[in-house]
Amino acid sequence: MPSGFVPRHPSLEDAYALLTFPRAPKTANRLASPPSDVSDASADDPPERPVVIRADGIARKFGNFVAVADTSFEVRRGEIFGLLGPNGAGKTTTFRMLCGLLVPSKGQIEVAGYDLRTAKAGARARIGYVAQKFSLYGKLSVEQNLRYFGRSYGFFGQALQDRIDASLEDFGLTDRRDTTAGSLSFGAKRDLSMACGLIHSPEILFLDEATSGADLASRRAFWRRINALAAAGTSVVVTTHFLEEAEYCDRFLIQDAGKVLALGTPREVKQRAAVLCAVSGQSLVVDRMSIEDAFVAIVEAGRRSQETPS
């Protein structure tokens, strides 16, 4: 078994995928080359990887409403980091602050070595962003969309054309390069949106509900691509409503009511859930626990603690 992988019990979804899906070809993006400071350290030793995102005591208020409260964490080079939580938990607000789309009410965020308070433009040049509602120009062709985003990141001439051609090939869009983005299927729009987000070989990729509306085959293909990007040194921050997809993250954070309830690897989060269940007289076995089981246990324990008088 490759290093960094944690075994888990197969699910019905796994069986369905094995029985019905053909083996996928390579999905690595040729534009995603490892940064020069990436070492050969295995996924078992992430502390040796440099920190690319640092959130230190960040919070966000809207009037008197606290959307995110005193949140701190780090994301390292080549790490897949997930943000999970129920609706209204604060994960989208946290995500938007990391992207520079929202300013924290307090605290500090560093992205790719840049303080977002003072050097937002420098950070944005090093990140890619794929929105849930694809940020494409429907009346422009596939190639024109790629050209627009490539130019916005400072690429021109043959260097830009090489990146466009590589993106078209990597995402299987070569035959549709002259097709307008608005006429593409949902899956092709998602692929084009990903290609636009990666056209400049970003150090960090932000994915907002990227598998929302996708079928199982498309979701599996998406995660194969994300794993290939991470292996090449790209850090990935993802929000998702599919709890089972947290298994594909190196680490993830669970929020509710703006507060961090758990942070760690899938196994560490399950262990946290098992401890919380034991305290309340329930029993969950880590090796038989799904991410959904852990998520429900942690969120329910967090809500009980808020209801208990201090």
Map each language-model feature to its residues.
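Conserved ABC transporter NBD signature motif
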Residues: 107-115, 122-123
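Catalytic Walker B motif of ABC-type/P-loop ATPase nucleotide-binding domains
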Residues: 205-209
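Conserved ABC ATPase "signature" region
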Residues: 147, 151, 158-176
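ABC ATPase "signature
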Residues: 263-264
